[in-house]
């Protein structure tokens, strides 16, 4: 079965790539639309500049950023961006389905707790269990 072509609100990826930031903002949900309407922060502009250089092949290093509040735009599709999660940089491969989301959504800041076995004396009944 053929894979269905990606569309965002009825527009193909090529059409989204040709849109200006203002036209694109109209398609996004309210939170992202308001964020783009206020303008990009200097950190976001710097990241966008690196992304554009990487697309042209002029930026060789991996793109690393602390800018978790950057909205994923169509021009980022296909790149791998390393997003900081508070401890390390997590690689995030940008796919078309991620357009309109924030970078931080794909780099979780909290780890799932993995408890070990309870120790001796952890409960009242384990006080009388022989220690190995």
UniProtKB/Swiss-Prot annotation:
Keywords: Ribonucleoprotein, Ribosomal protein, RNA-binding, rRNA-binding. The keyword Transcription does not apply. One of its GO terms (cellular component) is cytosolic small ribosomal subunit. It comes from the Archaea. GO terms for biological process: ribosomal small subunit assembly; translation. The keyword Ribonucleoprotein applies. One of its GO terms (molecular function) is rRNA binding. Belongs to the universal ribosomal protein uS19 family. Part of the 30S ribosomal subunit. Protein S19 forms a complex with S13 that binds strongly to the 16S ribosomal RNA. This is Small ribosomal subunit protein uS19. It comes from Pyrococcus furiosus (strain ATCC 43587 / DSM 3638 / JCM 8422 / Vc1).
